[in-house]
Structure formats: C-alpha cells, structure tokens
Regions:
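Generic hydrophobic, amphipathic alpha-helix propensity
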Residues: 7-15, 32, 57-61, 65, ...
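N-terminal intrinsically disordered/low-complexity leader segments
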Residues: 1-6
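Helix-turn-helix
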Residues: 10, 18-52, 56
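Hydrophobic/aromatic residues within well-ordered alpha-helical segments
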Residues: 50, 57, 61-65, 86-90, ...
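Hydrophobic/aromatic-rich alpha-helical bundle segments in the mid-to-C-terminal region
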Residues: 102-106, 116, 120, 138-184
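Short coil/turn segments at alpha/beta junctions that flank glycine-rich nucleotide-binding fingerprints
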Residues: 21-25, 76, 97, 140-141
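Short secondary-structure transition hinges
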Residues: 91-131, 139
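Hydrophobic alpha-helical connector segments
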Residues: 56, 67-96, 152-155
C-alpha cells in the first residue's frame, strides 16, 4: 500500500505534466487518473477538484523555484556572480515550471483567489531575494547603491519585462546572450564615466 503523502506527490507530478501540456482548461480529471493508471475516485479521495490539484501543482512548483533561487543565493559570496546566476536560473526555471509561470502571469487564471495570492507572494519573495543580493553587494563594496529597496524593485520590474520577449521567441541560444547583455547594462550602465 502506498503512503498517502507519496501518492499525493505522484498526483501532483503527473498533473503538472498534463497541465503544462494541455493547459488548465483542457486538462480533465480523467486524463490525470489515466496517467496514474488509477480511477478518478482514487484522485477525488485526495483532491476535491481539478482546481484543488492545480493549486497543489502551483504550490509545488513555487517551492521548486524558491529552492533553486535560494541555492543560487547561497552558492558564492560574490554578489555580482550571484545576481548573474540568479537572473539565468530564474529565467530557465520559469521555462521548466510552465504551470507556475502561466499561473503567475496569465490573465486567464486570475479568477482563482489562490492565483492572486501566489502572484503577490512571488513578487514579495523575488523583491526580497534581489534586495538581499543588492544589500550584500553594497555592504561588501561591489555595488554603489543608495536605496537597495528601490533598486530591487527596478531590477524585479526589468526581469518581469523581459519574460514575454524571451519566452515567445524560443531561441535558447539567444536567451543567454540577451541575458548577459542586459546584466552587463545593469552592472556597468550605458553612460560613459
């Protein structure tokens, strides 16, 4: 007999793949059950609805993203390298965690209360991570910032603005080059000194 928590995790992982393939609207409980080789009733035992499963998938992917970004922040003491890696890992993670990305940025799913809460939670988390990186860099003398909170908000806003062009044009070789160029402008500016 399988452990309840492990079965919940199996449901979440299987559902994640199906939601990312077909989207929330086109995914059915039948497809989720079929992918697990179980009956729908066994899934309804753990989750009351497709919406509840989707919420669990979004929470799961949010935790994956947070873990990956936390690992980047702890990976080195060099704040410039941390910020560079943070931006790249963030963008690559969004591509892998398509359900989370769609939930956070799609207007079609805005009618779910949990989506709006997740959006706000994500924005706060990201601004805090960036603020910490900038604070660490300012404290160590790597960065010259008067207001790390405002700078974090600006970087966060710039990153959000990059998402659409980067993900719509699925040319991954260019993504790295474009991200490096943007990060270099962030670090070195465009004004001659």
């Amino acid at each position: 007999m399988i452990d309840k928590d492990k079965y919940r995790e199996q449901i979440i992982k299987a559902s994640s793949e199906i939601f990312s393939r077909y989207g929330f609207k086109k995914t059915t409980m039948e497809e989720i059950a079929r992918s697990l080789r179980k009956g729908k009733s066994s899934i309804y035992y753990y989750y009351k609805s497709k919406e509840e499963i989707f919420e669990a998938v979004i929470d799961y992917e949010a935790q994956v993203l947070k873990s990956e970004l936390s690992a980047v922040i702890k990976s080195t003491d060099d704040p410039e390298r941390i910020l560079r890696r943070y931006v790249k890992v963030r963008m690559n993670s969004f591509e892998k965690l398509s359900n989370y990305y769609n939930a956070i940025f799609s207007s079609d799913l805005g009618h779910f209360d949990f989506i709006e809460k997740q959006r706000m939670k994500y924005d706060r988390m990201e601004e805090a991570f960036i603020r910490y990186i900038l604070w660490k860099g300012t404290r160590s003398g790597h960065f010259n910032l008067k207001d790390t909170g405002l700078a974090a908000l600006a970087v966060h806003t710039a990153l959000k603005g990059l998402e659409l062009p980067l993900f719509w044009e699925k040319r991954s070789y260019e993504i790295e080059i474009r991200l490096d160029a943007i990060i270099n402008i962030l670090f070195y500016g465009i004004v001659r000194k």
